Amino acid sequence: MPVKGRIIRVAGPLVVAEGMEGIQMYEMVEVGEERLIGEVNRVVGDKAYIQVYESTTGLKPGEPVYGTGSPLSVELGPGLIGRIYDGIQRPLDVIREVTKSIFVRRGVKVDALDRSRKWHFKPNTTLKPGDKVSGGDVLGEVQETSLITHKVLVPPDVHGRLKWLASEGDYTVEDVIAVVEADGKEIELKMYHRWPVRRARPIIEKLEPVEPLITGMRVIDTMFPMAKGGTGAIPGPFGSGKTVTLQSLAKWSAAKVVIYIGCGERGNEMTEVLETFPKLTDPWTGKPMMERTILIANTSNMPVAAREASIYTGITLAEYYRDMGYDVLLVADSTSRWAEALREIAGRLEEMPAEEGYPSYLASRLAEFYARAGRVKVPGRPERLGSVTIVGAVSPPGGDFTEPVTANTKRFIRVFWALDARLAYSRHYPAINWLVSYSAYVETVAKWWHENISPKWLEYRNEAYEILLREDELREIVRLVGTEGLSEKDKLILEIANIIKTGFLQQNAFDPVDAFATPQKQWKQLETIIDFYHAALEAIKRGVTVKEIREKLAPKIRELILARYNVPNDQLEKLDKLKQELLQALQELIEAKAGRASAAT
């Protein structure tokens, strides 16, 4: 029987209730006369400490608290794609219809999935009554959108013999589509099931991420690649372009499903996402972007405690689509706001603060979250591989990467895209600092690049990276003595580094051609730059100066830098032609130099 207690104290998002004998940790409760949704996060005797996911204004001691007997859970079934939810999986469009208001009122109860919509269910023809079924087995399919075929799965905790499976037809998510017999009991399975958000869905084994998650952003794909099933973070101070970079990731990534969590960020940023995503076209399929996207809007003016729920809601939805065998990208903007919510709740609970006031369990919570990423073999028949890639924004105050959230996040991620305010202020976007950023997936994804694009990819990528590092060392010398004190080879390094920075690393997220670069275009650009560098080195050995190269080839070098705008993804022969023209011009310089030298002798 569900527990019923009463409120004795209200402190911001924290409510203390007594008479709660039998309540469990992380049980979902309904607080007050309006039955606000909350979650138990501490139990002392008959007292329960509850974090409430809605505004507690007006709650008073004496009001009832009702236990539900189950943990905070989400509904998993067809109808999730294309929806916009709040942090506790309430669809915002349905709330507006129910309340006839543009504001999210307290205590609103709406279903996460549309109970009236009918879906065309196609049963799995390999399953017959009497067959053994277990968690993860595919019962049938539903065409959720033109991009996503939704596999209806046996819930992870159900095992038994299939007694009955529905025939092909139109059903709502509430209709029973299968009956499983287990331990003498009949379990009715519907098209949806519920799953606790704090509990990771089971897997068979984790696999090494080996395939790159192509994002269309050159600085990421070529310099600091992300793998499908990987973990990454984008830390950066205010105004450095975190949100635009994350939105570009969500727009152009080669993931089958994208889940975008706006966690505690400004409302106008979430509004921008809500306005732009429905109008965008997926570059991989040509279909509307919303046909593969789920948005979770939990802005800074919504209750603080719901930030934590939104992160867990998002990762649970991601795991569900991973279990179908899809590659899922989860983008969280920003994990710092979630950490601040943890800090506030910990303060209300009067826990001993650790560094900068954050709770001592900050690291373990971050670890739990990032550990749910991965490329995995999922349970059930037929055998499937799926992946969840997590990219979290971090907003360190003043851009200080030593603060606790950034420092702890770095322990659990393998890709670190550090945004630099100086680059952003000089209009270099994405403002990813190549001296501070790193990726542990460069070697593992190199095999894919070698097999699909070019066997020289890793060699050329490393050479470009070394040029950038060498340029940073030379910049200090140039500040002291100017460029005249450098050798011709070092002067060439500065010239090529400038081409790499402005013609390759920079990218305009709002330009129709430059916003997304295919792996083939990225390789052609990189190959042209590095081959030009090799030819220029040879020219310098033959006595040609960098000044002569700059003067003779200025128009062609400018053309190379602007190729990111002027060469569409389907016209890469233009880059081949440009490379030949550059190499030919260098050869002419060498011949002219040799001719002058022989004339002088």
Curated annotation (Swiss-Prot):
Signal peptide: none annotated. ATP binds at G236, P237, F238, G239, S240, G241, K242, T243. SMART domains: AAA. It comes from the Archaea. It is a peripheral membrane protein. GO terms for molecular function: ATP binding; ATP hydrolysis activity; proton-transporting ATP synthase activity, rotational mechanism; proton-transporting ATPase activity, rotational mechanism. It catalyses: ATP + H2O + 4 H(+)(in) = ADP + phosphate + 5 H(+)(out). Pfam families: ATP-synt_ab, ATP-synt_ab_N, ATP-synt_ab_Xtn, ATP-synt_VA_C. The keyword Ion transport applies. Its main location: membrane. It is found in: Cell membrane. CDD domains: ATP-synt_V_A-type_alpha_C, ATP-synt_V_A-type_alpha_N, V_A-ATPase_A. SUPFAM superfamilies: C-terminal domain of alpha and beta subunits of F1 ATP synthase, N-terminal domain of alpha and beta subunits of F1 ATP synthase, P-loop containing nucleoside triphosphate hydrolases. Keywords: ATP synthesis, ATP-binding, Cell membrane, Hydrogen ion transport, Ion transport, Membrane, Nucleotide-binding, Translocase, Transport. Its EC number is 7.1.2.2. GO terms for biological process: proton motive force-driven plasma membrane ATP synthesis. Transmembrane segments: none annotated. Gene3D superfamilies: 2.40.30.20, 2.40.50.100, Bovine Mitochondrial F1-atpase, Atp Synthase Beta Chain, Chain D, domain 3, P-loop containing nucleotide triphosphate hydrolases. HAMAP family: ATP_synth_A_arch. Belongs to the ATPase alpha/beta chains family. Has multiple subunits with at least A(3), B(3), C, D, E, F, H, I and proteolipid K(x). Component of the A-type ATP synthase that produces ATP from ADP in the presence of a proton gradient across the membrane. The A chain is the catalytic subunit. This is A-type ATP synthase subunit A.
